[in-house]
Amino acid sequence: MPSSPGNRQHSLRSACERCRLHKLKCTILPQKRFEGPQEAPEQCTRCARAKAKCVFGRRAPPKHRASSSNDRSSVSKGINSTTPATRTMQPNATGFVSSHRIELPPSPASNQSSLKHSSVWDNLLDKTTPQEPRADFSSFSYPPVPFDLQSMCLDEVDMAASALPTTEPNFSSAQREHEFSAMSMSPGLGYDNLDELLALNEQPNISDASSPLLSETDPSHGMIRLSSLLKEIHETQHNLQERSFSCTTSRGLAGYPIGRVLHAAQTFSSMVTNLMRPRVVQTSHTDVQGFNPSLYSSSPESTELPSLHQEFVSSLEQMKTNALEQSRRLGEDDLDKYASPCSSTTSLQDTMLDMPIVMLVFCCFASLSKLYCSVFRFFEKSLHSQSCRAKDSTYVPPLQDTRTLQLGELSIENDTEFKVLKALRMLLDAFQAAEASLGLPSSLTVLNSNKSTISASAEPAVSDTGSLQHHLRHSLIKQCVTFDDRHLERTLTSLVTHVENLKQLLRVQNGLH
């Protein structure tokens, strides 16, 4: 006998609570299946295997059935008792069934004429006809969203109440799309159009000298690397001046960044060495059809790059002519003494040593000399402050680290003196390698030999280190640029003075004077 609706609503579930919780299929043995709506098996196969408690719950009454029963009870109370029941159930009556009947619009596949002449759509389009309360169809469309910072970042931006707009703009969807496309394609600040911004992004980054896009055969590669090195030297100089390193404690000396100075000197040496390497020049013979046999040749023609001295001497003949013309105009007849006979016809335009690269080499070498002077000045202050304190013989360096630069053996009994001597040796080796890459003699040795003839108030004497300034002077005269040709020599003289002072302090503090 089939069960009643009440029994069906509260019947047992077909799966136990444990299987429903784990979302597993609840299987029951054939001999333990449901025999009736009120009878449940003892255990399912999963609970029996896990030795867990198996509970079969009952179904809750459906919500739609409960709501329909409540509606029927409330409607039945509102029906007029004088209306006969037979008249209420007629299809043309105005009772419960006719008042709650919903006429759906035609399907999309129907004819458009039926949609136009439908009574439902006529009532919806006719605003003068009183209608029953219906759902607001305008709620299905997106509300007007103001396209401003207030609505987009209201929770993240702290905006004053006076700056908020008093009226809310109402943009249509087309206007919102136009404003969004205009904002996404607007050029950056400071540029008139998008082409300038794209052209700026295509320019190489000078700060990245190790970019894989740069080639060694590219003429601009040397300029970019030298510009990056010059920027690094000036930043190191600025950091050493801004940061206050204590010269009275060993900890302040240990934290002094001489590694940056060594890196700058070693990088300068490697860059100048790369500029002196032979340059490969390929001769291309292109026919009418555009065939280039040099691109498929495995043995391109190569020419050796002349040295820095030979390259400048090759262009002295033309420089001499320009200098003589300038001296006739200005009345300076002493420019002729700087010129020398030309022994070669190689042009600077055929090599990588063009005028901007020579200028950058000169600036890097001069800036590196100033950086060394500031480092040695700090070492002098450290040794002066150390001489005023009592010596602590708590650190004994190994035997291989006690050799000196020029004085033989030094019995260093202090940690500060050992660090200064070690740093001085490393820095001088790197600086002499930088001078050797330029083809110059050691300025420390040459200027030291002439130091007896140089006084503190007199002008520094001209030494062999003026060979670089000699060539640079001719190059700069060609470009109509004037500069102090003895500025670098004065810097090197100051550098030698600092080195001699450091050596003298080491002699005095170790009893070797």
UniProtKB/Swiss-Prot annotation:
Record CDD domains: GAL4 (cd00067)
Principal place of residence: nucleus
DNA-binding region: 16-54
Alphabetical list of SMART domains matching this protein: GAL4
Example of a GO cellular component annotation carried by this entry: nucleus
Keyword Zinc: yes
PROSITE patterns: ZN2_CY6_FUNGAL_2
Compositionally biased intervals (Low complexity): 67-76
Keywords in alphabetical order: DNA-binding, Metal-binding, Nucleus, Transcription, Transcription regulation, Zinc
Keyword Transcription regulation: yes
Family matches, as InterPro entries: Zn2-C6_fun-type_DNA-bd_sf (IPR036864), Zn2Cys6_DnaBD (IPR001138)
Region (Disordered): 58-92, 97-116
Entry function: Transcription factor that regulates the expression of the gene cluster that mediates the biosynthesis of varicidin A, an antifungal natural product containing a cis-octahydrodecalin core.
UniProt name for this protein: Varicidin biosynthesis cluster-specific transcription factor
Protein species of origin: Talaromyces variabilis (Penicillium variabile)
